[in-house]
Regions:
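SAM-dependent transferase fold signal centered on methyltransferase-like domains
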Residues: 1-333
Length: 333
Protein backbone atom coordinates (compact mmCIF):
# COMPACT_ATOMS: atom_id res chain seq x y z
CA UNK A 1 0.00 0.00 0.00
CA UNK A 2 1.36 3.41 -0.94
CA UNK A 3 2.38 5.67 1.92
CA UNK A 4 0.17 8.71 2.34
CA UNK A 5 1.35 12.14 3.46
CA UNK A 6 -0.16 15.53 4.24
CA UNK A 7 -1.50 17.80 1.54
CA UNK A 8 -4.01 20.48 0.65
CA UNK A 9 -6.93 19.97 -1.73
CA UNK A 10 -7.57 23.19 -3.69
CA UNK A 11 -9.88 23.94 -6.61
CA UNK A 12 -7.94 24.19 -9.88
CA UNK A 13 -8.54 27.92 -10.32
CA UNK A 14 -6.78 28.56 -7.00
CA UNK A 15 -4.02 25.99 -7.43
CA UNK A 16 -1.19 28.23 -8.68
CA UNK A 17 -2.01 30.98 -6.21
CA UNK A 18 -1.84 28.50 -3.32
CA UNK A 19 1.33 26.87 -4.65
CA UNK A 20 3.13 30.22 -4.72
CA UNK A 21 1.94 31.01 -1.19
CA UNK A 22 3.24 27.66 0.07
CA UNK A 23 6.60 28.25 -1.62
CA UNK A 24 6.92 31.73 -0.11
CA UNK A 25 6.16 30.37 3.36
CA UNK A 26 8.48 27.37 2.97
CA UNK A 27 5.58 24.94 3.44
CA UNK A 28 5.51 23.15 0.06
CA UNK A 29 7.02 19.66 0.30
CA UNK A 30 9.34 19.79 -2.71
CA UNK A 31 10.38 16.18 -2.25
CA UNK A 32 6.96 15.04 -3.51
CA UNK A 33 4.99 15.55 -6.72
CA UNK A 34 1.90 17.74 -7.01
CA UNK A 35 -1.20 15.77 -8.04
CA UNK A 36 -4.34 16.89 -9.86
CA UNK A 37 -7.68 15.64 -11.13
CA UNK A 38 -10.34 17.29 -13.30
CA UNK A 39 -11.47 19.76 -10.65
CA UNK A 40 -8.79 19.96 -7.95
CA UNK A 41 -5.04 20.30 -7.35
CA UNK A 42 -3.41 18.40 -4.47
CA UNK A 43 -0.37 20.14 -2.99
CA UNK A 44 2.04 18.18 -0.73
CA UNK A 45 2.86 20.18 2.38
CA UNK A 46 5.17 20.11 5.37
CA UNK A 47 3.93 20.29 8.94
CA UNK A 48 2.37 23.67 9.68
CA UNK A 49 1.05 25.44 12.76
CA UNK A 50 -2.41 26.92 13.24
CA UNK A 51 -1.19 30.44 12.41
CA UNK A 52 0.03 29.26 9.01
CA UNK A 53 -3.30 27.56 8.35
CA UNK A 54 -5.16 30.78 9.11
CA UNK A 55 -2.89 32.74 6.74
CA UNK A 56 -3.44 30.19 3.96
CA UNK A 57 -7.20 30.40 4.40
CA UNK A 58 -6.91 34.05 3.34
CA UNK A 59 -5.26 32.95 0.07
CA UNK A 60 -7.89 30.45 -1.09
CA UNK A 61 -10.28 27.83 0.29
CA UNK A 62 -8.62 24.46 0.90
CA UNK A 63 -9.20 21.10 2.54
CA UNK A 64 -6.44 19.20 4.41
CA UNK A 65 -6.02 15.68 3.00
CA UNK A 66 -3.88 12.59 3.39
CA UNK A 67 -2.87 11.38 -0.06
CA UNK A 68 -0.29 9.35 -1.92
CA UNK A 69 2.16 11.97 -3.22
CA UNK A 70 4.87 10.13 -5.22
CA UNK A 71 8.48 11.18 -4.61
CA UNK A 72 9.67 14.00 -6.88
CA UNK A 73 12.22 12.52 -9.22
CA UNK A 74 15.16 14.78 -9.96
CA UNK A 75 18.35 14.23 -11.91
CA UNK A 76 21.35 13.14 -9.91
CA UNK A 77 23.89 15.87 -9.20
CA UNK A 78 27.67 15.71 -8.76
CA UNK A 79 27.03 16.29 -5.06
CA UNK A 80 24.85 13.15 -4.91
CA UNK A 81 27.66 11.06 -6.36
CA UNK A 82 30.60 12.61 -4.52
CA UNK A 83 29.01 13.35 -1.16
CA UNK A 84 30.14 16.98 -1.35
CA UNK A 85 29.71 19.96 -3.66
CA UNK A 86 32.74 20.21 -5.96
CA UNK A 87 34.19 23.51 -7.15
CA UNK A 88 34.35 23.92 -10.91
CA UNK A 89 33.98 26.51 -13.67
CA UNK A 90 32.07 25.96 -16.90
CA UNK A 91 33.03 27.65 -20.17
CA UNK A 92 30.79 26.54 -23.01
CA UNK A 93 30.71 22.75 -22.80
CA UNK A 94 34.04 22.55 -20.96
CA UNK A 95 34.31 22.13 -17.19
CA UNK A 96 37.48 23.31 -15.44
CA UNK A 97 38.22 21.44 -12.20
CA UNK A 98 41.03 21.72 -9.70
CA UNK A 99 43.72 19.07 -9.36
CA UNK A 100 43.43 16.67 -6.43
CA UNK A 101 40.34 14.52 -6.92
CA UNK A 102 39.96 15.78 -10.49
CA UNK A 103 39.20 12.32 -11.92
CA UNK A 104 36.34 11.68 -9.49
CA UNK A 105 34.86 15.14 -10.05
CA UNK A 106 35.19 14.74 -13.82
CA UNK A 107 33.38 11.40 -13.78
CA UNK A 108 30.55 12.89 -11.70
CA UNK A 109 30.21 15.89 -14.02
CA UNK A 110 30.14 13.79 -17.19
CA UNK A 111 27.58 11.43 -15.62
CA UNK A 112 25.17 14.14 -14.46
CA UNK A 113 25.58 17.11 -16.82
CA UNK A 114 24.49 16.59 -20.43
CA UNK A 115 25.94 19.95 -21.42
CA UNK A 116 29.48 19.11 -20.33
CA UNK A 117 31.50 17.33 -23.02
CA UNK A 118 35.05 18.05 -21.80
CA UNK A 119 36.71 18.18 -18.38
CA UNK A 120 40.17 19.72 -18.00
CA UNK A 121 42.31 20.89 -15.11
CA UNK A 122 44.70 23.87 -15.13
CA UNK A 123 48.29 22.83 -14.43
CA UNK A 124 49.79 26.32 -14.51
CA UNK A 125 49.02 29.82 -13.35
CA UNK A 126 48.35 32.51 -15.94
CA UNK A 127 51.78 32.81 -17.54
CA UNK A 128 53.81 34.15 -20.41
CA UNK A 129 53.53 37.16 -22.66
CA UNK A 130 50.02 36.20 -23.76
CA UNK A 131 48.71 35.42 -20.20
CA UNK A 132 47.60 31.88 -21.00
CA UNK A 133 47.27 28.69 -18.97
CA UNK A 134 48.21 25.07 -19.60
CA UNK A 135 45.69 22.28 -18.95
CA UNK A 136 45.58 18.54 -18.36
CA UNK A 137 42.82 16.60 -20.10
CA UNK A 138 40.76 14.65 -17.55
CA UNK A 139 37.66 13.30 -19.31
CA UNK A 140 35.46 13.62 -22.38
CA UNK A 141 36.61 14.97 -25.71
CA UNK A 142 40.26 16.01 -25.98
CA UNK A 143 40.02 19.72 -26.81
CA UNK A 144 40.24 23.16 -25.21
CA UNK A 145 38.08 25.10 -27.68
CA UNK A 146 34.36 25.74 -27.31
CA UNK A 147 31.54 28.23 -27.89
CA UNK A 148 30.58 30.10 -24.72
CA UNK A 149 27.29 32.01 -24.39
CA UNK A 150 27.08 35.09 -22.16
CA UNK A 151 24.62 38.00 -22.01
CA UNK A 152 23.09 37.10 -25.36
CA UNK A 153 26.42 36.82 -27.21
CA UNK A 154 28.46 33.82 -28.37
CA UNK A 155 32.22 33.59 -28.04
CA UNK A 156 34.58 31.18 -29.71
CA UNK A 157 37.17 30.44 -27.04
CA UNK A 158 40.38 28.40 -26.98
CA UNK A 159 41.21 28.19 -23.28
CA UNK A 160 44.81 27.14 -23.87
CA UNK A 161 45.45 29.76 -26.53
CA UNK A 162 43.78 32.83 -25.01
CA UNK A 163 42.75 33.54 -21.42
CA UNK A 164 39.04 33.52 -20.64
CA UNK A 165 36.98 33.09 -17.47
CA UNK A 166 33.21 33.09 -17.09
CA UNK A 167 33.67 34.34 -13.52
CA UNK A 168 33.93 37.92 -14.81
CA UNK A 169 30.48 37.74 -16.41
CA UNK A 170 28.83 39.84 -13.70
CA UNK A 171 31.62 42.42 -13.83
CA UNK A 172 31.32 42.71 -17.60
CA UNK A 173 27.62 43.41 -17.20
CA UNK A 174 28.36 46.08 -14.56
CA UNK A 175 30.61 47.92 -17.00
CA UNK A 176 28.03 47.58 -19.78
CA UNK A 177 25.50 49.39 -17.58
CA UNK A 178 27.93 52.33 -17.23
CA UNK A 179 28.60 52.74 -20.95
CA UNK A 180 26.18 54.78 -23.05
CA UNK A 181 25.41 54.39 -26.77
CA UNK A 182 27.92 56.45 -28.74
CA UNK A 183 30.63 56.32 -26.06
CA UNK A 184 34.17 55.74 -27.32
CA UNK A 185 35.66 52.71 -25.53
CA UNK A 186 39.27 51.54 -25.61
CA UNK A 187 39.70 47.90 -24.51
CA UNK A 188 43.46 47.59 -24.07
CA UNK A 189 43.64 43.84 -23.35
CA UNK A 190 40.58 42.56 -25.16
CA UNK A 191 41.29 38.83 -25.39
CA UNK A 192 38.51 37.08 -27.30
CA UNK A 193 36.23 40.11 -26.78
CA UNK A 194 33.89 39.57 -23.81
CA UNK A 195 34.06 43.23 -22.75
CA UNK A 196 34.44 44.70 -26.24
CA UNK A 197 31.60 42.92 -27.98
CA UNK A 198 29.15 43.40 -25.11
CA UNK A 199 29.86 47.15 -25.10
CA UNK A 200 29.67 47.36 -28.89
CA UNK A 201 26.33 45.54 -28.79
CA UNK A 202 25.10 48.31 -26.49
CA UNK A 203 26.01 50.90 -29.12
CA UNK A 204 29.46 52.05 -28.03
CA UNK A 205 32.20 52.66 -30.58
CA UNK A 206 34.89 50.20 -29.50
CA UNK A 207 38.58 49.84 -30.26
CA UNK A 208 39.76 46.41 -29.07
CA UNK A 209 43.42 45.48 -28.95
CA UNK A 210 45.52 42.53 -27.86
CA UNK A 211 49.06 41.31 -28.40
CA UNK A 212 48.04 37.65 -28.68
CA UNK A 213 47.47 36.66 -32.35
CA UNK A 214 45.18 33.76 -31.43
CA UNK A 215 43.05 35.99 -29.20
CA UNK A 216 42.75 38.48 -32.06
CA UNK A 217 41.65 35.75 -34.48
CA UNK A 218 39.00 34.59 -32.02
CA UNK A 219 37.87 38.19 -31.48
CA UNK A 220 37.54 38.75 -35.22
CA UNK A 221 35.52 35.53 -35.56
CA UNK A 222 33.35 36.52 -32.60
CA UNK A 223 32.57 39.92 -34.08
CA UNK A 224 31.34 38.18 -37.25
CA UNK A 225 29.55 35.47 -35.24
CA UNK A 226 27.57 38.14 -33.38
CA UNK A 227 27.12 40.46 -36.41
CA UNK A 228 28.87 43.35 -34.66
CA UNK A 229 30.45 45.96 -36.94
CA UNK A 230 31.02 49.01 -34.70
CA UNK A 231 34.37 47.72 -33.50
CA UNK A 232 37.98 48.22 -34.63
CA UNK A 233 40.28 45.28 -33.83
CA UNK A 234 44.03 45.82 -33.53
CA UNK A 235 46.87 43.38 -32.90
CA UNK A 236 49.88 44.77 -31.07
CA UNK A 237 51.31 46.32 -27.92
CA UNK A 238 48.63 48.25 -26.05
CA UNK A 239 51.15 50.80 -24.76
CA UNK A 240 51.87 51.86 -28.34
CA UNK A 241 48.42 51.41 -29.87
CA UNK A 242 46.67 53.40 -27.13
CA UNK A 243 48.66 56.49 -28.10
CA UNK A 244 46.78 56.62 -31.41
CA UNK A 245 43.72 57.69 -29.43
CA UNK A 246 45.09 60.35 -27.06
CA UNK A 247 42.31 62.30 -25.37
CA UNK A 248 39.46 60.40 -27.04
CA UNK A 249 38.22 57.59 -24.80
CA UNK A 250 35.13 57.91 -22.63
CA UNK A 251 36.04 54.55 -21.07
CA UNK A 252 39.31 52.62 -20.97
CA UNK A 253 39.20 48.93 -19.96
CA UNK A 254 42.42 47.66 -18.34
CA UNK A 255 41.72 43.98 -17.70
CA UNK A 256 45.29 42.73 -17.28
CA UNK A 257 45.29 42.03 -13.53
CA UNK A 258 48.91 40.93 -13.13
CA UNK A 259 50.56 43.84 -14.93
CA UNK A 260 48.03 46.57 -15.74
CA UNK A 261 50.02 49.06 -13.65
CA UNK A 262 52.70 49.12 -16.36
CA UNK A 263 50.16 50.61 -18.78
CA UNK A 264 48.61 53.31 -16.61
CA UNK A 265 50.29 56.24 -18.35
CA UNK A 266 49.19 55.34 -21.92
CA UNK A 267 45.71 54.48 -20.61
CA UNK A 268 45.34 57.89 -18.98
CA UNK A 269 46.68 59.62 -22.05
CA UNK A 270 44.06 57.86 -24.18
CA UNK A 271 41.25 58.90 -21.84
CA UNK A 272 39.63 62.24 -22.51
CA UNK A 273 39.30 64.71 -19.65
CA UNK A 274 36.41 63.30 -17.65
CA UNK A 275 36.93 59.83 -19.10
CA UNK A 276 36.80 56.78 -16.83
CA UNK A 277 39.44 54.07 -16.53
CA UNK A 278 38.39 50.62 -15.29
CA UNK A 279 41.54 49.16 -13.74
CA UNK A 280 41.92 45.52 -12.65
CA UNK A 281 44.63 44.03 -10.46
CA UNK A 282 45.40 41.19 -8.04
CA UNK A 283 45.83 42.37 -4.45
CA UNK A 284 46.30 40.89 -0.96
CA UNK A 285 43.30 40.75 1.35
CA UNK A 286 44.89 43.11 3.87
CA UNK A 287 45.64 45.83 1.28
CA UNK A 288 43.05 45.44 -1.46
CA UNK A 289 43.33 48.87 -3.06
CA UNK A 290 47.04 49.50 -2.72
CA UNK A 291 47.30 50.20 -6.46
CA UNK A 292 45.55 53.52 -5.92
CA UNK A 293 48.99 54.86 -5.03
CA UNK A 294 50.31 53.74 -8.44
CA UNK A 295 47.30 55.31 -10.16
CA UNK A 296 47.90 58.67 -8.48
CA UNK A 297 51.63 58.50 -9.23
CA UNK A 298 50.92 57.93 -12.94
CA UNK A 299 48.42 60.80 -12.95
CA UNK A 300 50.95 63.12 -11.28
CA UNK A 301 53.51 62.30 -13.99
CA UNK A 302 51.01 63.58 -16.57
CA UNK A 303 49.87 66.56 -14.55
CA UNK A 304 46.40 65.03 -14.40
CA UNK A 305 43.96 64.50 -11.56
CA UNK A 306 42.10 61.33 -10.63
CA UNK A 307 38.87 60.79 -8.74
CA UNK A 308 38.16 57.22 -7.59
CA UNK A 309 34.54 56.40 -8.41
CA UNK A 310 34.27 52.76 -7.40
CA UNK A 311 36.27 50.03 -5.67
CA UNK A 312 35.21 46.39 -5.59
CA UNK A 313 36.23 42.77 -5.30
CA UNK A 314 35.52 41.05 -8.61
CA UNK A 315 36.33 37.50 -7.45
CA UNK A 316 38.55 35.53 -5.12
CA UNK A 317 41.77 34.66 -6.93
CA UNK A 318 43.74 32.63 -4.39
CA UNK A 319 43.79 32.22 -0.60
CA UNK A 320 43.79 35.77 0.83
CA UNK A 321 44.28 37.27 -2.65
CA UNK A 322 41.56 38.90 -4.73
CA UNK A 323 40.94 40.22 -8.22
CA UNK A 324 39.80 43.81 -7.61
CA UNK A 325 38.61 46.69 -9.75
CA UNK A 326 39.19 50.41 -9.31
CA UNK A 327 37.17 52.79 -11.50
CA UNK A 328 38.61 56.30 -11.64
CA UNK A 329 37.90 59.48 -13.57
CA UNK A 330 40.79 61.29 -15.23
CA UNK A 331 40.81 65.10 -15.19
CA UNK A 332 43.25 66.83 -17.50
CA UNK A 333 44.40 70.39 -17.01
Amino acid sequence: MAEESSGLRVRREYGERMRKALVEKGLLDRSRKIRADESHVYLPVLDMDSASRIELEQIAPFEPVQKDFPPEERPATPEDILGYRPSFEVVGDIALVEEGDAEAVAAALIATSKGIKVVISPISEVEGEFRTRRFRHIAGEARTSTIHKEHGLRYRVDLEGAYFTERLGTERLRIAKLVKPGDFVLDMFAGVGPFSLLLAKKGAQVVAMDKNPLAIRCLQENAVLNKIRNIEILEGDAAELALRYVGRADHVIMNLPHSASSFLVPAMRAAKSGGVVHYYCIAPEDDLYRDEALIRKAADSLGAGVDVLYRGIVRSYAPRRHNVVIDFRVTKK
